[in-house]
Amino acid sequence: MADIRDAMMERLLDDAGIREGMRVLDVGCAFGALTFLVAKRVGRTGHVVGLDRDPQLLSLARTKAREQGLSNVTFIEADLANVPAEQGLFDAATGRRVLMYQPDAVAALRGIARAVKPGGLIVFQENDASIGPVSLPPLPLHIRVSEWIWHTVDREGADLHMGFHLAPAMEQAGLSVEHVRAEASLQTPKEHHAMGPILRAMLPRIVRYGIATEEEMGIDTIDARLLEERSKANTTYLGEMVFGAWARKP
């Protein structure tokens, strides 16, 4: 089954106009998940530069790129607000769940815009905790999992409402916003988004902040238990809203 959130991102890239032959900067790329989506879209005549501050994540991204046989990607260690000048100017910049972690999202967007050509695209997707979790009837385990994740993100100083703040931040950064949207991250008994890998990746942080213990989470069985809870209730679960927007550099 295709990843629900990747499908949202693919639609956003499509509608924004990320296309074959483009040279794209993917900021806060981590291990390259979005970088690879963009790389497949721009094709052999295009190129994607993934940028992150974490050398361990970048090493993992390079390994994954080799495993996927992608020759049109490069990964560099740098701060997203200060893209090295030697990289030149890009046709577009992309990011996913990145601005929410910036102490000043407007300043970060201004720095990113400096690396984009005049008229170039800046495309971002940001999650937002303002709405959700919601289901009828309520699903206690789903609510707990959502709290584990969002309480951890909150303790790390992230903006839990970056989705709603996305378009205004782009405008304040001097960009011309062309479109903003919000889609619900939904799960049903038949549509499933795996939470186990997310919790496993966040495990050290969740435990460190005292939000939950490893035993309490039961990561190895969490996805089966979530699916069982939804199936027994035969209901749709709205986890959170996912905002997307694109703008152009004047």
PLM-predicted stretches and their roles:
Residues 2, 178-237:
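C-terminal helical/coil "lid" or tail adjacent to the Rossmann-like core of SAM-dependent
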Residues 3-22, 37:
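Conserved alpha-helix/loop element of class I SAM-dependent methyltransferases that forms part
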Residues 25-27, 31-83:
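Class I SAM-dependent methyltransferase SAM/SAH-binding core
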Residues 82-92:
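A short acidic, Gly/Pro-enriched loop at the edge of an enzyme's catalytic core
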Residues 91-105:
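A short SAM/SAH-binding and catalytic strip from SAM-dependent methyltransferases
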Residues 106-121:
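A short glycine-rich, Lys/Arg-flanked "PGG" loop and its adjoining helix->strand segment in the class I
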Residues 123-192:
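Conserved catalytic/acceptor-binding region of the Class I
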Residues 173-176, 242-250:
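Core SAM-dependent methyltransferase catalytic element
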